[in-house]
Each structure stands twice: as C-alpha cells, then as structure tokens.
C-alpha cells in the first residue's frame, strides 16, 4: 500500500529523474513463503516509501518558492517609478510567449536564463523578500535603450516577414446584455409606468366623485351609546370588592378559632349568664323551695312483713271458713249457751275453742261482712297475692298525705319558674306508689312535711288576698 502511494506521488510530479512504479517495487515471483523473506521485503518497502516521501517534500518546497517569487515580482512592479512604467511595455512583451520580438530582446533572455541559475545557487533563500528585491535590481543592470530602437528597414522587413496579427482578446470578459433583454426590460418598465398612471387617474376620479356627492350624515355609532370606560372600571371595582368581602367572610366562617379564644368566649358567656341571673334575683323575691321527699319514707316499715304473711294466711283460710260456715248446721240453745258461757267447765279454755252463732244473732252480718263478694271483688289481695295492704287506718292516712302533697305541687306550679325542678318527679313517684301499694307505702307525716304544708297554705292565702286586693282596686 505504501509503494502504491509512493508510485502515485512520483507519477504526479513531472520532470523527475526516476519514477517508482508498482512493477519495479513489487515482484510477486521473488516472494517466498518464509518469515525471513517476508521481513526483508517489508524493510525494502519501508525504505522505498521513505525515499518517495522525501522527494514529495522537496517538490512541495520548490512549488512554494515559485509562488513567493511571483508575489515579489508583482509587488515591485507596482511600486516602480513612472520612467520604469514607460519602459516596462517592451519588457513585458518580451516575457510573453505570443510576441514576435522575443528573439531580439537580449536583456529579457538573460533574465529568463538567470532564474534557474539563481534557483540552483540559492535554493534555501528564495522565500525571503530581500532576495526577491536583489533579483529585480540585477535584472536592470544590462538594460539599454538602443536594443529597443527600430529602423525603417527593419520595420519594413518585419512587416513583410510578420504574419497578420491576431486580434487582442481580453482575459476579463465584460458582460453586455442582449438587445432583446434590453428591449424586454424597457417594455416592462413602460408597462409599470402606465399602470401607475392609470391607478392614479382612477383614484383621482374617485376622489372627485366623492367630493361632488351631497353630504349625508352617518348614524351615531353604537360605541358612543356604551357606558364610559370610567363607569366600567368603577363597576368592576365594586364587583371585585364585594367578591373579596364575600370570600373573606367565607374564610372567616370556615376558620376554626383558637382554643384560648373559645375558652374566653365561654367564660364571657358564663359571666353574662351569672349577671342576668343576679339581676333577676334582685328583682324577684326569693321563693320557697322545698327539698325532695326522702326515699326512705316510701319504704315499707319493718313490721309490715309479718303482717303481710299473717294476712296472706288469713286470705287462704277465709274461703275455706266461708264454705264451712255455709255448710255447717245451726247450733242449739244449750250448745250456744255453753259456748257463750265463759265459765262453763265442759268447754276447754284456750285458742282451740270455736264460736257458735245462731241465725238470730245480730253479729252474724258483721261477721260475714269481710267475706262478702263485694269486698273480695274490690280487694286487690286476691288479684295480686304477693302484694298486701295494711290496715284501713294506715291507708287513709297515707292517701291524705299524698293528696296534700299533690295539692302543694299544683299550687307551686303556678308560682314557680318555668325550668323544671326535682319536685316534679314526686307526683309521678306517688302515682307509681299508689299503683303498686304492695311495694311502697305512703310517707309518714314528718316535721318538715308539716312545715312545708303550713308554708304552702300561708303563701296561698297571701296570693288570694293579693288577687282580691287587685280586683277591688280595679
């Protein structure tokens, strides 16, 4: 691959002594399949590649040198004097290959011959500007005007010998538009001018027609009937303010108060309530308020239980006694007398004696009265055998006390405040006790109950007197 590149580089550089080709560097017939032969060929290829690279580098340097020389010549020609400019025409014509007087100019031939000699003498210093100036100065050393003078004979022979010169062809082409293009452009410009003139005339005619028309006022635009901008801004501001207040109130309503604020509000409410109660207490006189009846009053006494048991036994024996009494025969007078005589020795004394009654005895009806059907129908003992009444006297007293308590409660309801009190429960308790007499007995009169009744009576009398006085005053 390196040999191919080297050969390509050598072919691209004209005028060289030797050319490295692919056939000279690589001969496949000489290659053996041994390692030593392979490495030897590899070294040869590397050496050939290095030699080709050196040649390419030298060619590149020569090319750069020629470019520097041409640039220096162009710079010195532009800075030369006016006399040199007048004499530069024959020199330039001598350097050009197309001029016929190339053989006559000896000075120019010397300059062209000196260039390669100078390149051979100083190949490393050509790139500098000082060398270029020295070279230009040496070109004008052997210059003479006589070399450029021509005689008439020479001119005639030159005219005969010379062929017809060719026309001068400039190297820079100046573009000139075609006549057709120019004509098309003029026609286009003329059409655009005519169009503009036509539009101006139309616009002028329209303006004249508008001016000639009779004036007619247009209706009032609708935008004038709309409210002013200041009014709209004011309305929006009011609406925004109301919305802000509404949202603020909603936020305050949804906001939970702090604990100490709620506690202070509760304390303030309690203080106000106490002040109101104090004012009411000062205005109204203090009313009597009795304590509730103790519960032990409704409890049955200790001697009620044996009485209940005795009465329960009597209630069981009374039906049997009634049946025996109805079925037993009437006793005789002798037996009756013996039964009635307490001193009779025949009858034993004690609790086993039985009383014998005659049909004519007035006490028979009295004896049968407790066992009548009316008494058994009204007596709740037979209906509820577990609950028994006590004596009639005790029940009357109890009913009287309960009636007094009810009357006192009704009187107190009229003069009492609307809020409920513990005394309201006493009528229900008394009614329950009256409905269940077997479990509760009516309360016994005490000193406190008697004092309460007297106070109720006194207050009732005072109220009646006050009502009578007010009615008389009216």
Curated annotation (Swiss-Prot):
The annotated regions of Polar residues compositional bias extend over: 325-335
Expressing tissues: Expressed in the retina and kidney.
Ranges in coiled-coil conformation:
188-250
The record's GO CC annotations read:
astral microtubule; centriole; centrosome; ciliary basal body; mitotic spindle; mitotic spindle pole; photoreceptor cell cilium; photoreceptor connecting cilium
Name the Gene Ontology molecular function terms of this record.
Answer: identical protein binding; microtubule binding
Q: Basic residues bias located where?
A: 422-431
The segments labelled Required for interaction with CFAP418 in the record are: 274-454
Give the subcellular location: Cytoplasm, Cytoskeleton, Cilium basal body; Cell projection, Cilium; Cytoplasm, Cytoskeleton, Microtubule organizing center, Centrosome, Centriole
Recorded superkingdom: Eukaryota
The UniProt regions of compositional bias labelled Basic and acidic residues, in chain numbering, are: 450-468
UniProt KW Disulfide bond keyword: no
In its UniProt record, which GO terms are filed under biological process?
A: cilium assembly; cilium organization
Q: Where is this cross-link: Glycyl lysine isopeptide (Lys-Gly) (interchain with G-Cter in SUMO2)?
A: 397, 413
Q: Which UniProt keywords apply?
A: Cell projection, Cilium, Cilium biogenesis/degradation, Coiled coil, Cytoplasm, Cytoskeleton, Isopeptide bond, Ubl conjugation
Annotated stretches, region: Disordered: 78-126, 185-210, 308-364, 412-474
**Family the UniProt entry places it in:** Belongs to the FAM161 family.
Q: How does it assemble?
A: Interacts (via central region) with CFAP418 (via N-terminus); the interaction is direct. Interacts (via C-terminus) with microtubules. Interacts with LCA5. Interacts with CEP290. Interacts with SDCCAG8. Interacts with FAM161B. Interacts with POC1B. Interacts with CEP78. Forms a microtubule-associated complex with POC5, CETN2 and POC1B. Interacts with CCDC15.
Say what the protein does. Involved in ciliogenesis.
The protein here is known as Protein FAM161A
Source species of the chain: Rattus norvegicus
């Amino acid at each position: 691959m390196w040999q191919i590149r080297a050969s390509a580089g050598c072919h691209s550089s004209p005028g060289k002594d030797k050319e490295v080709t692919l056939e000279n560097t690589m001969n496949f017939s000489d290659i053996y399949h041994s390692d030593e032969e392979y490495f030897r060929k590899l070294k040869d290829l590397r050496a050939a590649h290095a030699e080709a690279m050196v040649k390419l580098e030298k060619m590149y340097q020569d090319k750069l040198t020629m470019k520097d020389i041409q640039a220096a010549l162009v710079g010195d020609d532009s800075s030369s004097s006016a006399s040199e400019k007048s004499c530069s025409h024959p020199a330039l014509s001598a350097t050009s290959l197309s001029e016929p007087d190339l053989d006559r100019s000896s000075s120019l031939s010397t300059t062209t011959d000196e260039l390669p000699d100078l390149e051979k003498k100083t190949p490393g210093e050509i790139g500098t500007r000082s060398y270029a100036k020295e070279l230009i100065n040496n070109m004008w050393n052997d210059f003479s005007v006589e070399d450029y003078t021509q005689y008439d004979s020479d001119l005639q022979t030159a005219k005969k010998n010379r062929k017809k010169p060719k026309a001068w062809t400039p190297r820079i082409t100046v573009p000139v538009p075609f006549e057709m293009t120019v004509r098309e452009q003029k026609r286009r410009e003329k059409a655009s001018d005519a169009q503009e003139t036509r539009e101006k005339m139309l616009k002028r005619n329209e303006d004249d027609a508008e001016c000639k028309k009779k004036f007619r006022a247009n209706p009032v635009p609708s935008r004038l009937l709309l409210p002013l901008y200041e009014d709209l801004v004011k309305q929006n501001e009011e609406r925004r303010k109301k919305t802000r207040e509404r949202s603020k109130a909603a936020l305050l309503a949804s906001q939970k108060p702090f604990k100490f604020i709620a506690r202070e509000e509760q304390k303030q409410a309690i203080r106000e309530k106490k002040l109101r109660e104090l004012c009411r207490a000062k205005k109204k006189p203090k009313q009597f308020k009795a304590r509730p009846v103790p519960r032990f009053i409704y409890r049955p006494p200790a001697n009620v239980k044996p009485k209940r048991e005795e009465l329960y036994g009597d209630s069981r024996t009374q039906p049997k006694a009634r049946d025996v009494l109805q079925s037993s025969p009437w006793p005789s007078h002798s037996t009756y007398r013996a039964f009635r005589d307490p001193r009779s020795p025949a009858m034993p004394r004690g609790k086993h004696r039985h009383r014998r009654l005659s049909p004519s005895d007035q006490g028979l009806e009295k004896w049968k009265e407790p066992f009548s059907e009316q008494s058994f129908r009204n007596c709740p003992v037979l209906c509820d055998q577990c609950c028994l009444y006590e004596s009639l006297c005790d029940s009357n007293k109890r009913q009287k006390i309960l009636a007094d308590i009810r009357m006192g409660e009704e009187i107190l309801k009229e003069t009492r405040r609307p809020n409920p009190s513990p005394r309201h429960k006493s009528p229900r308790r008394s009614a329950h006790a009256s409905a269940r007499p077997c479990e509760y007995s009516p309360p016994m009169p005490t000193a406190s109950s008697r004092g309460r009744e007297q106070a109720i009576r006194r207050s009732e009398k005072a109220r009646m007197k006050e009502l009578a006085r007010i009615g008389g005053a009216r």
